[in-house]
UniProtKB/Swiss-Prot annotation:
Family: Belongs to the 3-hydroxybenzoate 6-hydroxylase family.
InterPro entries, A to Z: FAD-bd, FAD/NAD-bd_sf, MOase
Pfam family, any one: FAD_binding_3
Entry's Gene Ontology BP terms: quorum sensing; secondary metabolite biosynthetic process
Sorted UniProt keywords: Monooxygenase, NAD, Oxidoreductase, Quorum sensing
Recorded catalytic activity of this chain's protein: 2-heptyl-4(1H)-quinolone + NADH + O2 + H(+) = 2-heptyl-3-hydroxy-4(1H)-quinolone + NAD(+) + H2O
UniProt-listed Enzyme Commission number(s): 1.14.13.182
Highest rank taxon of the organism: Bacteria
Role summary: Involved in the terminal step of the biosynthesis of quinolone which in addition to serve as a potent signal for quorum sensing, chelates iron and promotes the formation of membrane vesicles (MVs). Catalyzes the hydroxylation of 2-heptyl-4-quinolone (C7-HHQ) to yield 2-heptyl-3-hydroxy-4-quinolone (PQS).
GO MF, any single term: monooxygenase activity
Record's protein name: 2-heptyl-3-hydroxy-4(1H)-quinolone synthase
Length: 382
């Protein structure tokens, strides 16, 4: 029997690579008519890269993007609030920033294309004694030893595993864009915190910079109202920024790509049912404030493949969730907190936030970094 994966995003492709390496038969279906990554830039911290190194040549992957040493966080007046590395001190490679389509191309490279079906999705899952009988939208029926929902935040597989799941709105909406620009220090990303808004920037190629811009919104506001914003109108929201923030805001009108979405998260109890399991955003979508969403999907794929190879049975999926949920919940909460801090608006609250952030001891920051960057890949290597 085969393993069926739905979703040709980062989680699904990474898992297909892991199963290929392990010699496990798999079939991947993608409901879109083509495999086309949605988004702009992406960052991979050291824990994500460690998980990827199991099936990818990192030297070749790094040639697709730009090395990332860390991120500096600034106040809206241009003064420094804090710095954060992209790896543990012992990892000399650091992190990586690149276009999403470059990461997808790397994950697709070498995969057996005959095992990937586009324009196809799961329409029915029926429990068997030692398998799941899956009917696909093309009419074919498959008896599967494992079914994996890697189909993102709007997962359809999740309706089978966890039908009562609901997304929680973060109170922020976000625009992601790519502009033609070369930072003076291309290995350092930056994020500027203003009054209810943030502006981030990361070099993703020698001549392109990824920019993300967030604004505090009320959930009851229609998304389309915020979504139809030109780069020129978007830049005007950050007119009160000084220093590096003002420099980045002036580049927004030159955007070659502009993608908009509200920031949401998913937290709950159930990732598996029988021999069906959710991974990545389908299981635990989180706000992107720590840049760990893709990393969590990659860690999921790394661990699930290893556990399944050792014990290919339904109980293994319960063990998988037990081994992952504490780490996922910690990072989800930390990311949510960062987003909430960025939403503070009044002059007094912004002053208080900036003061408190600057007062956080270096030892506390190091402990946070240790927890962030010690993923399942690092644990397996120890």
């Amino acid at each position: 029997m085969t393993v069926l994966i739905q979703g040709a995003g980062i989680a699904g492709l990474a898992l297909a690579r892991e199963f290929t390496k392990a010699g496990i038969d798999w079939l991947l279906v993608e409901r879109a008519s083509e495999i086309r990554p949605i988004g702009t830039g992406i960052t991979l911290a050291s824990n994500a890269l460690t998980a990827l190194s199991s099936t990818l040549d990192l030297d070749r992957l790094f040639r697709r993007g730009m090395p990332l040493a860390g991120i500096n966080v600034y106040a809206h007046d241009g003064s420094m609030l804090m710095s954060m590395p992209s790896s543990l001190g012992g990892n000399s490679r650091g992190g990586l920033a690149l276009q999403r389509h470059e990461l997808h191309a790397a994950l697709l490279e070498g995969l057996d294309e005959s095992r990937i079906r586009v324009g196809v999705s799961i329409v029915q899952i029926l429990d068997g004694l030692d398998h799941e009988r899956v009917t696909l939208s093309d009419g074919t029926v498959h008896d599967c030893s494992l079914v994996v929902g890697a189909d993102g935040i709007r997962s359809s597989v999740r309706r089978y595993v966890w039908p009562e799941a609901t997304l929680r709105h973060s109170g922020e909406t976000c625009w992601r864009l790519v502009v033609p620009h070369r930072l003076e220090d291309a290995e350092l990303a930056g994020e500027v915190w203003g009054h209810g808004k943030r502006l981030g920037f990361i070099q993703i190629s020698p001549r392109e910079m990824y920019v993300y811009a967030t604004l505090k919104v009320r959930r009851e506001e229609p998304e389309d109202e915020e979504g139809f914003v030109t780069p020129q109108r978007l830049a005007a929201h950050y007119a009160d920024f000084d220093g590096i923030g003002a420099s980045i805001a002036r580049l927004i009108p030159s955007a070659t790509t502009l993608v908009h979405n509200d920031l949401e998260e998913l937290a709950g109890a159930s990732w598996c049912r029988g021999r069906v399991v959710l991974i990545g955003d389908a299981a635990h979508a989180m706000t992107p404030n720590l840049g760990q969403g893709a990393a969590m999907a990659l860690e999921d794929a790394f661990l699930l493949a290893r556990l399944w190879c050792l014990a290919p049975r339904a109980e293994t999926l319960i063990l998988f969730q037990q081994q992952r949920e504490a780490r996922i919940e910690f990072i989800r909460k930390q990311s949510w907190i960062v987003g909430r801090l960025g939403q503070w608006e009044s002059p007094w609250s912004v002053w208080l936030r900036n003061t408190l952030v600057r007062l956080v001891p270096n030892a506390s920051r190091r402990r946070l970094h240790q927890r962030l960057f010690t993923g399942v890949g690092e644990m397996a290597a120890q």
